[in-house]
């Protein structure tokens, strides 16, 4: 099967950031056919994918797009299992090895009601992310005094359920961010992908992993 026979169905509106690479540009450069599924803000639904399930289709986009529009395409989308929940893997290893070892867990809808308690525990700034590896919203740090506006914005953009469990921890400064692929306990490849909040891809970090 040649790469021209592989088709992609994508929805990238939620991922667009100025200066960041776009997957649709990579598909165009490689002459790969793709369909961009638009998100309707009124119905909160994605447009249907016009490909057949007997075609080779790769899916890429937000979790809701994958869950609602994957009709059984092969290979489809690559995602996460429950063992990528932070509460799962952080309970298997010494918590002091984790950046957010001081974390606690709260349902998304309860965070706003725990404002003063969180301030007493963590100080003026906190970090919030979904427990799930699927990340229905991107983790963020926020000043406790601004938490109402930030949670309201997150609800409107990402629509997390009120009962979705979230990791809440003291906000910490991050310079470098990395991703590595590990197989059978061995780091196979990886890269730095961000430095001080800006896109900065480096691949000379494998030996340091």
Predicted features by range, described:
Residues 2-209:
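Active-site nucleotide/adenylate-binding loops and adjacent lid/helix of ATP-dependent enzymes
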């Amino acid at each position: 099967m040649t790469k021209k026979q592989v088709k992609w169905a994508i929805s990238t509106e939620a991922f667009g950031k100025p200066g960041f690479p776009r997957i649709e540009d990579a598909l165009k450069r490689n002459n790969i056919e793709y369909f961009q599924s638009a998100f309707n803000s009124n119905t909160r639904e994605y447009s249907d994918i016009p490909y057949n399930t007997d075609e080779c289709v790769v899916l890429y986009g937000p979790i809701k797009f994958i869950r609602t529009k994957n009709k059984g395409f092969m290979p489809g989308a690559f995602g996460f299992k429950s063992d990528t929940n932070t509460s799962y893997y952080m309970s298997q290893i010494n918590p002091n090895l984790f950046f957010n070892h001081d974390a606690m867990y709260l349902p998304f809808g309860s965070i706003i009601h725990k404002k003063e308690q969180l301030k007493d525990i963590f100080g003026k700034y906190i970090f919030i992310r979904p427990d799930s590896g699927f990340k229905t919203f991107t983790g963020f740090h926020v000043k406790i005094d601004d938490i109402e506006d930030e949670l309201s914005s997150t609800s409107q953009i990402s629509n997390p359920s009120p009962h979705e469990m979230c990791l809440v921890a003291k906000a910490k400064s991050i310079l470098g961010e990395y991703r590595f692929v590990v197989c059978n306990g061995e780091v196979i490849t990886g890269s730095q992908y961000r430095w001080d909040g800006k896109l900065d891809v480096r691949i000379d970090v494998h030996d340091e992993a």
